[in-house]
Amino acid sequence: MPIRIRWTSREYFGSVLLLLGLSGMSQLYFIYIGQYFLAIGNHIVSIIIPIGIWVALFYSTLIIFESYAQVERREKLRSRFRKTIIKSSKIKKFLNFPITKPILIVFILFNIFFFSSFFISILFLSNTIAFLTAEVISAIFCLLVANLIERNYGRVRRI
């Protein structure tokens, strides 16, 4: 079943705004890296391209969030009469919060793919082109992983 993104529903509007803001905050970090550590003076590469990457990261976190929300809704319907777990650790509560999973997945994957592709492409290209290539490659990988998570984890099986 394809994911339906409920942008304006009362239940998810605050979560969507949080995902949008956190995706933008991650790109501010990469804009800072590009301008000050890599000395990229081209404003198109250092500011406008990360805005496009911001939209791609937001969309991938939204896809992952919606797939986890779908599974959570299904589990709530199934586990209405089960016993509740009394004690859980703070890190488990933090990781079970529905917004943290997609944010952590996308940010960790983006950082891994960005720095690995940047260090490989810096051997052959200039700083500006290597930064641009690394951002685009890592955003594409994040979208592919979000699609895989949506297909494998968020699948609703009808019996």
Where on the chain are the PLM-derived regions?
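Alpha-helical transmembrane spans of integral membrane proteins, capturing the lipid-embedded, hydrophobic core
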Residues: 16-24, 47, 51-55, 107-111, ...
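Hydrophobic alpha-helical membrane-embedded segments
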Residues: 17-28, 33-71
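Short membrane-interface loop/juxtamembrane segments of multi-pass integral membrane proteins
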Residues: 77-103
